[in-house]
Amino acid sequence: CCNSRIIVCFSSTNDPTDPWYIYSLTGNPLNNNRWTDFPAIALSETGLVITANLIIPNVSWQVGFDGSVIWHLNTSEGFAGGNVNATVYTQIAHNGKFVRNLHPVRGHDNISDQLQFLSNRNFDLQNDTIFLITLTEGTSDTTVTAQALISNVPYGVPPNGKQGDTDTTDATKGLQTNDGRVLGAIQKDGWIQFVSTTAHGANANAGIYHGFIANAQSPDPKLT
């Protein structure tokens, strides 16, 4: 686990055959014998963020989760081959419980107006809470805040997907769906739309959860 790394590459020009600037981020940022899993990225005008999960070694990712982190890098410096000022934000939690699988919200044109992240309780049989995490870039300081939003439509961990030859009497058969984490999100004009897998129809089938957050960058976002 101590050799776990995230490798980040910035192009020096718009010609991919020209040299690249390569940076290495430790997969054990807290120096506590953890490794990094499931990275995801988003961009703002000035920053690159990379989210990831920290995993305890020698156990499954399901039970070995030990917090999600956000790396923030300066893109201007990255494209110039300079000091990207890589900063990692950890211990992201709500009511003392880690917020898991932080999914970066991408701008509709791939550039985020505001760096934000979504999460949920992806292993719960039923839950109505979506977590909205906001990273505010500043010239001298960067802050991370978390809000819990309540949905009028609950979600739940999905069962395995049923295929034509699936034995429906055995819940372990079928296409494994893993869990109900948020796996897609975009923002535009102050709103966020996002999707995840979910249980549908008295937990009988796997379905798609489509959420909408209005006024997502305001102090009072609304989830439907």
Segment roles from a protein language model:
Residues C1-T224:
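C-terminal PAP-associated
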